């Protein structure tokens, strides 16, 4: 396997119990990284973390956390620091594939999506950037989608929220580059995962096909 030069790097991944988050955590642990995972379902998260521990024989920290809650975000970072002493990489991966036409998206849908995908990233970046600034190194990776740059019809509120995340990424990248901190977004395409599978299973019903 190719070497990503990640041995003993501490990587915090939100939305780490399923899909791309879990797959990334497993690969990074295989590369020797010390991984901290968070998810809302504590027992399920622990099961998935145990899979990674057993397969990689590496230290994996699982922390139950709802990233839409500011206090829980603070606790997530504090527990990671307490266990691993630092954070080298933050992966803001939490999110859903919410997609509907404009007339079907309620105020609550907008608020929930922005809180989950954008404000969670804002809060966690705010918490980890001082740590990275102090040691003059670090990396933040924000999950996004191509629809954040070129949205399709019926892609709300996700496309708007991800567009904001892409803008946040570029803003932070410009601001914190002098501190040797890299901030990047990955525009993810269709990947076979639980959220995508659910979307495709329910799409015919949504479209009344």
Q: Whereabouts are the PLM-identified features?
A:
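Conserved glycine-rich cofactor-binding loop
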Residues: 17-18
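Substrate-binding pocket helix/loop in short-chain dehydrogenase/reductase
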Residues: 101-102, 106-114, 196
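Active-site loop-to-helix junction immediately N-terminal to the catalytic Tyr of the SDR YXXXK motif
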Residues: 105, 151-160, 171, 195
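Active-site helix of classical SDR
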Residues: 125, 161, 169
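Alpha-helical segment proximal to the catalytic Tyr-Lys
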Residues: 130, 174-178
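Residue(s) in the substrate-gating loop at a strand-loop-helix junction
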Residues: 145
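Conserved small/polar residues in nucleotide/adenosyl-binding loops
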Residues: 199-205
């Amino acid at each position: 396997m190719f070497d990503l030069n990640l041995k003993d790097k501490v990587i915090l991944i939100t939305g780490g119990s399923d899909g791309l988050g879990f797959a990334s955590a497993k690969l990074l642990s295989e590369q020797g990284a010390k991984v901290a995972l968070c998810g809302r379902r504590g027992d399920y998260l622990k099961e998935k973390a145990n899979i990674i521990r057993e397969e990689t024989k590496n230290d994996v920290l699982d922390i139950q956390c709802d990233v839409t809650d500011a206090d829980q975000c603070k606790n997530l970072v504090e527990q990671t620091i307490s266990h691993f002493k630092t954070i080298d990489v933050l992966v803001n991966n939490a999110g859903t594939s919410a997609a509907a036409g404009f007339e079907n998206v309620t105020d609550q849908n907008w608020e929930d999506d922005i809180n989950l995908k954008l404000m969670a990233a804002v809060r966690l970046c705010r918490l980890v950037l001082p740590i990275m600034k102090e040691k003059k190194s670090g990396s933040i990776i924000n999950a996004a989608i191509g629809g954040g740059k070129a949205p399709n019809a019926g892609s709300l509120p996700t496309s708007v929220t991800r567009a904001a995340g892409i803008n946040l990424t570029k803003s932070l990248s410009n601001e914190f580059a002098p501190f040797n901190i890299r901030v990047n977004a990955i525009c993810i395409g269709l990947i076979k995962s639980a959220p995508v599978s659910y979307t495709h299973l329910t799409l015919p019903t949504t479209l009344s096909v």
